[in-house]
Every structure is written in C-alpha cells, then in structure tokens.
Regions:
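N-terminally biased helix-coil "hinge/interface" segments that flank
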Residues: 1-665
C-alpha cells in the first residue's frame, strides 16, 4: 500500500490527509495553524493523522505541502534584505511597477549592459562596476536579484552577473529570466526581488517539514504546491519560492475538481477567517492572466485568479444599530467563537454571560472577551505608554472586554493590540449561530445560546430589541452570511462575463433576484456553472447559497480537507518558451539561453525552436519531480500584412511537460 501525505496550512487550521489513489482518504486530521511558526501546526496535524491511521512510515511514498507562508510574508512585508542589480535600466524604470515600494529601502545597483529586442547587446556589461558595488552591499543582504534589459531575449548578462555574485559572495541569486519569459523588465525585476526575499523563509519551512518527516521515519519525496495548482519538488521551491504564492487556494481548486469529477465550476472555500472564490476550467484553476497580486504588488507569477473576502465561520458579528433598520455586519476580523472559548474557560465565560443577562439595558461590550497571546511571535515594540499598560492588564489572563477597558480611548487601544497580534477577541460568530440552531454542535452550545440572547437584546435606533430571542438572532446571522456569500459568488461570475465593479452584486436588479422578488418583470440571476462548496462548514451554509444564485450546488465528501487532497492529487507541470524574431528581412532568429541562432528559413527555425522547447520542458519537469512526463507544444506567431505579403514579426514556441510526481525515492 502506497500512501500520499497531503498537508495544507490554512488561515485557521492546518489539515493533513493520508490518501490512497484507490481508496481515497484513509485518515484526516486538523491542528490550529500557528502563524508565527507554521511548523508547530504542521507537526500537530501530521502527528495526529499518522497516529489515527497507524500506518508504517514505509507506506508513505509522497508528501506534498501547500503553504500560506509566501503569501503572508509578502502581505506583511517580511523576508530577507536583498540587493537588486538592475542592468541596462535607468532611474525612471525603477519608478515603474511598484519596484521602489517592493524594495522597501533595500540596495538598488544600476549597471551598464542589457540587450535590444532582437537579443543583441545594447552596451557591454560593466563587470568591474558590478564587482565594486557587490563588495559594498554584500555584508548587509541575504541575497541578490538580477534583472537585465530584454533578458528574455538574451539572458547572457543576467547569467554573467549571477556567476560573478555567487563567486564573490556565495549568496543566493535570483535571475529575472528564470521566473518569467514575458516582457516588462521592471515588473520582472519586482518579481525577482520578492523571490530573493522569500528564499530564506521557504527554505526554513521546507527544512523543518523534512525534519518532521524524519521524526516519523518517512523517507519520501517532498513536493510543494505552486500558485497555479501544479506541484514542484522541494529543492525547486527553495530557489523559486515566489511561485508558491496563493498555493493554498490553488490546491483547493485541484481538490474540488478531483473530489467531484466536475471540470468546469465556481468553487467557494469557506474557512474560519476568509472565503475564497475562484473558477475551475477544464479541470484546472483559472489563472490570472495579468499575474498574481499580493500585498498590493502585481507579480509576473502565474497563479489562480482568486477573490477573497473576510467572511468565515469565525467572523466577528457586529449589529449596526445607527440605522432605523438594524443590520448585521460580518467580519472582516476573525475572533474566537464563544462556544470555543467556553471549552477552555467555562467558569469565566458562563459567569460573565449570566451576569450580563441580568443587566438591562445591555452593555456595548456584552458577550465579548479578551484572550492574551503569549506565544504568537508578535512584538510589543513601539507601543505607547497607554497601550503598554493595557497590554500588561490583558496579559494577566482572559477577561471580559467590559472589565479590561477603562473608557472609550481604551477601546481604540484594544483594537490596535488586536491588529498587532498581541491579543485576541472572543465574541459571537456564525459558528455560534450554527450551534444555537443545531446545525453544527462541536463545542459549548449553552455559551453560544447565551451570547445570542445578549446580542438579540441590543437596541435599534427606535429603542426596540433587534431580534426576538436567540433563535431569531442566529437565523439572522446565518442568512446574512449566506447572502454575503451569494453576492461574492455572483460577482465572480459576472467578472468572468466581463462585468466588473465593486458592489455590482448589490445592484437593485440583482438584489431583487437574491431576495426572490418579482413583479411585472421577473428578475432571476442564475449561475450556469455548478457551485462547489468547500470547507468544514460548507455543508451548513452552501445549500442555501446555491439556491440563492440558482445553481446546482455540490458539497463533496471530505470537503473539509479538499486543500490537503489537492496537494497530493496534482501534477507537475512546467512550461518552456522559445522566442523567434526577424531582425532583418530573411533572417530568422531563435532566442535561447545558450545562444541566439539565425536561420534563412522560418520553417527550419521553428523546428529547432520546437526541439529546444521540448527538451528543456522535459528536463525541467524531471527536476521538478515528474515521472514519465508528457509534452504538448503550442506555436503562436505574429505577422504583418505589408504590400500584399504576410511578414513574420515574431513568435513563440511553448512546450508544456506534465506528469505525476515520482513516488518513494
């Protein structure tokens, strides 16, 4: 029996599955994700799933990991200090594509060199100047990024610069041409900088994951999921970590297609913190053709086109009472559900809730608690005296918000401590509402019911209670989540059809459709694609969401671990692109890493380009961990019609090699 171990680090939970291609999921387990150190959560999930299945280490032939580390690091601005060697560019180029913002004050070195669009040198590479500049900055950085003008047409200057830096410093170097074959030098440079910054972080995670495998005696290849859903060997991921951004969402799409057998669908994955909505087309994730955007920076990385909203089972529920008609606001902040907090602190939670229920009118901070985070890795550096004082009081132990804060100013300070990751709030959530309604019962239902009663007693602008008891309030919360989810799904569908715009789903006509209102004109928006719901709570909410958008709803078995399944059922897939140009009439040039070769006949040039692309894609697929890869090739040519004759301008030959990963080494 050969098993695969799939691991996914989500925003709230880290999932692990043991998977057999014939039997499906053999065992699954969850552990809380530890954002400050993902390894802790990974170890917990792996320990639990291996113990529950009682398997032998030798039975595990493949381990695959999807991780939020790269995405989170870029959003939070974390990573190593890097130097960018910018060859053939000028100051104006550095102002484009958010490059200066991405550098965050890290060294930027301008060096003469680069090529023209046909791959001919526009200036000699100034190696002497490069050697001097590298000597100055090397002691202050953890790596280098190198980007040269038109390196996608001729990368020789990037390669020469890389070799010099490695000889001189021994530090890792990322070259732009290795990450993307597309034009746009500044954005390719930005992608290279981000990649170089992530190398240390991803290398550390992979080494730790391999240590966990060794602890269990697992001797198997370790793969990492890319942002397009494909797999790559851990050794490749260490050098190209930027390609792991959005790997978790991509993995969920691969898992969704596998679990359902559906090749075209909208997929919505609801977790504790967020809901991710995307599309699968022909069994593969629909990719963002413009490159993935993370932390406000648009990269040149092919990754899943994903819409993410701060809406999950653990979203904070706030009742907005300033309007004549009160509304429920969900998220975007994640909090600890009352039903979960009561499991760890039953006396505190029930005593406080019971006391608050005796008070009338209800307080603004009813059903809200503060939990200190003592092992979150967050720093208290930079707090002012009042914030530091509030933090010290919070660190004493769990408390009600009402007891901790000493005035309105403290409420703002508490919010800042939460954003810094120093404390967490426990409050009423959709998870609590589901406990009250009996749809999901895993924790303390009594605490959830008391919290719902307190929330229902809040007063509207007219002075009346916002809901008639715990059940009515909980139904209101669940309906609000379902409505928000349906709006997000509709917006993704409309974007696919070319109708984009924030809040488009709240247009009066679409609102009428979602509310089921009809008159002389019957307005009914309907998804033509199936809607696949993923996540531990998808079965609770998504039958209703599918009904709202008039779609065929599908919630597969093991929807709660689809991401981890996607990590092991995916394929290795790599692309190799060879460019062709016509520098002058009758001379056709093949642009390749080793040399630029000219031909007098276009057909011969295409044959050579095809051969090179096939061989290179097979080699790279093998390095990425594929076994018995298959190759397909696409040609794309641009021509101009001049004087009644078609004139070849340029073209590409792209080979794609794909195969399942090799099993036990």
């Amino acid at each position: 029996m050969k098993l695969s171990l799939g691991i996914d680090t989500g925003g709230t939970y880290t999932d692990a599955v043991l998977f057999d291609e014939e039997r499906g999921v053999v065992a699954k387990a969850k552990a809380l994700t530890t954002r400050h150190d993902l390894v802790i959560g990974i170890a917990g999930a792996v320990d639990a799933v291996v113990a529950s299945a009682a398997v032998k280490p030798g039975d595990i032939a493949l381990v695959s990991l999807s991780t939020t580390l790269a995405t989170n690091a870029l959003v939070e601005g974390r990573g190593g200090r890097v130097a960018l060697v910018f060859i053939g560019f000028d100051e104006a180029d550095a102002q484009r594509a958010g490059l200066i913002e991405a550098l965050q004050g890290d060294p930027l070195i301008f060096i003469a060199g680069g090529h023209n669009p046909h791959g001919d040198p526009q200036a000699p590479l100034d190696l002497a100047a490069l050697e001097r500049e590298v000597a100055i900055v090397a002691p202050t950085v953890s790596g280098f990024a190198v980007s040269a003008y038109f390196a996608t047409r001729n990368p020789e200057h990037e390669i020469e610069a890389r070799d010099l830096i490695v000889r001189q410093t021994g530090l890792p170097v990322t070259c732009g041409h290795e990450l993307s074959a597309k034009l746009d030098g500044p954005r390719r440079a930005l992608t290279s900088v981000l990649n170089a910054r992530l190398i240390g972080l991803i290398s550390g995670l992979i080494s730790a994951a391999q240590a966990i495998m060794a602890t269990h005696g697992i001797d198997a290849p370790l793969m990492v999921v890319r942002g397009d859903g494909a797999l790559m060997a851990a050794a490749v991921a260490k050098t190209r970590p930027i390609e792991t951004i959005l790997s978790g969402p991509a993995s969920s799409l691969v898992g969704a297609s596998y679990l359902t057998g559906i090749r075209d669908a909208i997929v919505s994955d609801i977790g504790g913190t967020t809901t991710d909505v995307a599309v699968i087309h022909d069994g593969a994730p629909h990719l963002d053709e413009h490159g993935a955007t993370v932390g406000g920076l648009r990269t040149m990385v092919e990754a899943v086109a994903m819409t993410t909203v701060g809406l999950g089972g653990d979203s904070e529920v706030i009742v907005v009472t300033s309007r004549v008609t009160p509304v429920v606001q969900l998220g975007p902040r994640r909090v600890v559900p009352l039903c979960m907090m009561a499991v760890d602190h039953p006396d505190l939670v029930h005593r406080a809730l019971d006391q608050q229920l005796l008070s009338d009118p209800p307080g603004d901070q009813d059903a809200r608690f503060v939990l200190p985070i003592t092992d979150g890795g967050a720093s208290a550096v930079g707090l002012d005296l009042s914030e530091a004082d509030l933090l010290q009081r919070a660190l004493v132990g769990p408390s009600t918000v009402a007891k901790l804060v000493r005035g309105h100013a403290d409420v703002g300070r508490l919010t800042r401590l939460v954003k810094r990751g120093l404390v967490m709030i426990a409050a009423f959530t959709p998870t609590d509402a589901s406990h009250v309604l009996g749809d999901y019962v895993a924790f303390d239902t009594s605490a959830a019911e008391k919290g719902a009663r307190l929330m229902a007693r809040k007063r509207s602008a007219l002075g009346t209670a916002v809901a008639d008891g715990a059940t009515e309030f909980s139904e209101w919360v669940v309906r609000s989540l379902e409505r928000r989810s349906a709006e997000t799904v509709l917006e993704v569908g409309l974007a696919i059809d070319g109708f984009e715009g924030a809040g488009l789903s709240r247009h009066p006509l679409l609102a009428a459709s979602l509310e089921g209102r009809s008159g002389v004109v019957d307005v009914a928006a309907r998804l033509t694609l199936p809607l696949i719901g993923l996540g531990a709570c998808a079965g609770i909410y998504y039958p209703a969401v599918a009904k709202l958008v008039r779609a065929d709803g599908v919630i597969p078995n093991d929807a709660d671990v689809a991401n981890a399944i996607g990590a092991v059922v995916g394929r290795v897939r790599v692309h190799s692109t060879v460019y062709l140009s016509q520098p002058e009439r009758g001379r056709f040039r093949v642009h390749h890493l080793d040399a630029q070769v000219d031909f007098v006949d276009l057909a011969n040039a295409v044959v050579v380009a095809d051969t090179i692309a096939r061989a290179e894609s097979l080699q790279r697929a093998g390095e990425a961990g594929a076994a018995d890869a298959e190759v397909s090739v696409e040609h794309a040519f641009t021509t101009a019609h001049i004087e009644d004759e078609d004139y070849f301008v340029e073209g590409t030959v792209t080979a794609t090699a794909s195969g399942r990963p090799r099993l036990t080494r």
